[in-house]
Amino acid sequence: MSPELWNPVLRQLTIGWSYEAWDVPTGASMSAVRAKLLQTDVVAANVTMPHKQWAAGAADTVTDGVRLSGAANLLVRRDKQLEAHNTDVSAVTALHGDRAERHAVMFGAGGAARATLVALNGRAARVTIADRDPEASSQLLELAASLGIDAMAATWDEAQRQAPEASLIVNATPLGKSCHDEPVWGKAGLAEDAMVYDFVYAKHVTASIASAQEQGLRYADGWDHLREQAAAMVPVLGMPPRTGLLLERTLGMIHGEDAGVGII
């Protein structure tokens, strides 16, 4: 997704930059990756799972979002040092706004969920976390405790039962990438003041977002998140102000094509 989004924009800006995809498989020499990032022809790098926590630790300086979440999705080269940012936190903050949540139910406990938890700091009275991997849930609970957030782990079924009374539902899993998937919380109706935040982006409208639309609820989907995530990079990289508009136009064109499916 990132080369498709950024390269048309960079060509229009005529600043001499290009966006390349690097495949960094699990088990690769991360010291070699870090050394490559410090080469003088590198401006910055987006980092995807499963390397977001590595990126936070590999940086010389970090933002508050990285320090709090323990994850980074953007490394910027500043001379011979790396500066870590978490634009997932920025995107969730922008899209969620200043809502106060009485109860947030989060499906998934990976990097996207960590960013969401940081963005909700001070704005959620209670959080329920459900993940197929108990260890991932445990790690997210530790983060919640460090932030002073009242959180509990639940089984998938328990979280689905709690969802109808929640004010925020977060899908930080791949559920929805298939057009045959159900909403992440099941088929139940949600509270009239609920918001649905779905990290999945796809050519089709995901089941979770379709249900939110049918119920007249506020929502943010994976395309919204991609837009805000990219917009957050613009000032960090010192790019021209018109970059944001170019990104939005390019993302709109990609959304209208068969751009595949993904989760941030």
Describe every region a protein language model picked out.
Residues W22, A130-R132, Y197:
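The conserved SAM/SAH-binding core of class I Rossmann-like methyltransferase domains
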Residues M1-R99, K203-V205:
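Phosphate/diphosphate ligand-binding glycine-rich loop within oxidoreductases
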Residues A124-L147:
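NAD(P)-binding Rossmann-fold cofactor-contacting core
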Residues L147-A220:
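Rossmann-like adenosine-cofactor binding region
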Residues N86-V89, H96-N121, D131-A136:
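Glycine-rich adenosine-cofactor-binding loop
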